[in-house]
Structure formats: structure tokens, C-alpha cells
């Protein structure tokens, strides 16, 4: 380790320095925000939880997928979709006390933590598994194209998510904010249950590829 560190001393030095700068900025922002008499934590700050949960939970999922309890691909997709829906259920439940048309409201930060946890669990069932099956199931000459289509579908999904989010005021004014998030909970849960029902048929179409 010492020889490797000395060989890449300059790069390691600047890498370590960059981490010190980043964490210095983070600590300064936290001190400036929380040091006030009234503190507000922006929801965007919680996005770091996704990376944290991935780092902590990815080894666990890797162990499960390598064990005898490894489910089939369609079942993994179904579980991932249901976990995604459960994450939105936490947000829907947490927003029950927010009246329709409210401009501001305060809720427990734990609802966002739970939501990010279950969304990350769902992501770990979907994203790496999907990429793996693209490489396994696509014809060899089309693997690059299929990976491109997979990433393109993610880009389209992000665009549609932005468009859908723009309707939050119109929908929440009619059925409340909890009703708006309940839609995003029920749709993926329903899709996950459909994946369970189609598991046998999809496995036959995979011709024994696991």
C-alpha cells in the first residue's frame, strides 16, 4: 500500500485536498443554516441519502443475488417496483396533515428518509439487474444499441417525471398532496404485481438465461 501511495502521491494529495474542501463547504453550510434561530433543511439535501444507502446496501444485495435465494429477473423487477411504490406511500402518509392548496407546511424529515431508503432498495433491484439482463439477453451484435436504448429510456423517464411534477399544484388542489403521491405509489405497486403474474411467461421467453 505504501509503495502504491508513493507512486500516486500527487494524485492522492489533490484527491484528499478536494475532499477536505468539499467537506469544509458542507460543514460551513450546515453551520450557517442550523445556527440560525429558525432552521430550514431543503428537501434537495436528502438526495445524498441515495448514494449513502447504495454504498451500504449494495453488498447485501450482491450476497443475496449470489445465494440460493436469488429470485428470477422478472421477480426482481416486480420487487423493485413495489419497493418504489412503498417509498411513495411514506411520502403520501407524511403529507396527510397538509391541507389542499397549502403553500408551506412542516413534516417530519423521517418520511423523506424512509422514502429514499425504499426508493434505493427498489433501484438496487432494478438498475444493475436491468443492465445485466440487457447484456445477457440482447444479441451480441446489438448489445451496444440495447444499452443505448436502456439509457435513452432513463432519459425519457426523467423528462416525463419533470412534466408530471409540473401538475402537482393542479392535482393536489383537487385531491390533496397525499392523493398526488398516492398515485405514484399505486401505479408502480400495481405494475410490480403484474410482473409477478407474468413471471412464468417471461422466464420461458428468456430461454433459461438467469
What role is predicted for each listed range?
Residues 47-54, 147-162:
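Glycine-rich segments within core transmembrane alpha-helices of 12-TM secondary carriers
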Residues 5-15, 66-84, 209:
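Cytoplasmic membrane-interface "Motif A"-like loop-to-helix N-cap segments
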Residues 100-125:
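Hydrophobic core of transmembrane alpha-helices in multi-pass small-molecule transporters
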Residues 23-32, 82-104:
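C-terminal ends and interior cores of transmembrane alpha-helices
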